[in-house]
């Protein structure tokens, strides 16, 4: 990427996680800061930016504008930049790992080459899916994209959709064809004061429109704020799952390539207090996952193994973190988290 910036190439590098975006951004800027770019005496570190969920709306808009105008050459992004934004001439797209679906892969690669010839690069790791793609390239290049899969029986997902649907049009129990568990959900919303029963017609009376009240990424509605202790600025907001995995005490939280250490995670007020710091490592949480089998629906024999499909209850606790050195990925050690962060949301799901 430093070479692409030096040669004036415009590019997007897609990463699979927010943390990876920040790590790659910092490491690229570190390399650029050691390059003497005599032709214009510019600070090349300003020619690249990160782009991911968790940046403020005005931050993302500014990055989009700078990329379109050519003020920056490259963006390191999550799939937040995959759709919906026209960013003009891109010479190169780099996918750091297979994004999980062929549909997402083609959306990312298709960011380049819209007006001229361009290059798409897929970097494969050592995981099984990566090795399969390396040997069977036709899987990506010659077959269609996947079907979208949604479990409409998930009560948490149904609840969010029933709330949004009720705000648009009154519901009845006959809507069970669309929402199989509506008979269980409506009493909950009546008790919460969000629906009114008009002779079997249920009308939304909630104070706010519910569609903007839940995330497309997950089902948690508990929002945490990340506050810079030095100036009181709110860096970002995140849901509880992210907070437990990213801003536990002593974690290194990164925003636009800048490092912050978490001083305190207040679970009552849902505030993570951070302060700027410069260290040679980033942190990765270590989790303890507990899976309880509730009910088995189907069993299939594979040689000496039995695969079972059924209901499971998943609980996850963040118990420690490891410190990984920048650039060489050396593990600098583990530290226990003082109070294990057990997610209060116990996720009921289907599993094999």
Task: Tell where the protein language model's regions lie, with residue ranges.
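Helicase motor core with emphasis on the C-terminal RecA-like subdomain
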Residues: 1-170, 175-211, 216-223, 231
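Extended Lys/Arg-rich polyanion-binding regions
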Residues: 117-120, 126-140, 161-173, 182, ...
């Amino acid at each position: 990427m430093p070479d692409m910036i030096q040669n004036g190439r415009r590019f997007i590098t897609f990463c699979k996680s927010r943390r990876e975006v920040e790590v790659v951004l910092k490491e690229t800027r570190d390399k650029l800061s050691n390059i003497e770019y005599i032709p214009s005496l510019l600070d090349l570190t300003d020619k690249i930016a990160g782009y991911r969920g968790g940046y403020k709306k005005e931050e993302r808009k500014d990055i989009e504008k700078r990329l379109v105008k050519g003020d920056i050459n490259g963006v390191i992004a999550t799939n937040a930049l995959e759709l919906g934004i026209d960013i003009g001439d891109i010479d190169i797209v780099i996918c750091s790992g297979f994004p999980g679906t062929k549909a997402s892969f083609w959306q990312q690669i298709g960011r380049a080459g819209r007006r001229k010839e361009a290059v798409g690069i897929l970097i494969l790791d050592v995981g099984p899916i990566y090795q399969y793609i390396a040997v069977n390239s036709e899987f990506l290049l010659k077959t269609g994209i996947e079907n979208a899969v949604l479990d409409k029986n998930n009560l948490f997902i149904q609840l969010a959709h029933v709330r949004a649907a009720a705000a648009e049009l009154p519901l009845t129990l006959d809507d069970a064809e669309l929402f199989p568990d509506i008979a269980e959900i409506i009493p909950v919303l009546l008790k919460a004061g969000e629906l009114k029963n008009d002779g079997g017609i249920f009308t939304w009376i909630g104070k706010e429109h519910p569609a903007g009240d839940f995330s497309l990424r997950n089902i948690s509605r508990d929002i945490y704020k990340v506050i810079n202790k030095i100036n009181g600025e709110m860096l970002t907001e995140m849901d509880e799952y992210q907070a437990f995995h990213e801003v536990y005490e002593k974690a290194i939280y990164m925003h636009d390539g800048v490092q912050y250490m978490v001083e305190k995670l207040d679970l009552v007020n849902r505030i993570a207090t951070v302060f700027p710091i410069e260290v040679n490592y980033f942190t990765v949480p270590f989790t303890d996952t507990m899976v309880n089998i509730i009910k088995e629906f189907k069993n299939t024999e594979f040689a000496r193994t039995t695969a079972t499909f059924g209901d499971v209850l998943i609980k996850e606790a963040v118990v420690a973190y490891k410190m990984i050195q920048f650039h060489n990925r050396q593990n600098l050690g583990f530290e226990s988290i003082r109070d294990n962060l057990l997610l209060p949301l116990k996720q009921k799901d289907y599993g094999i």
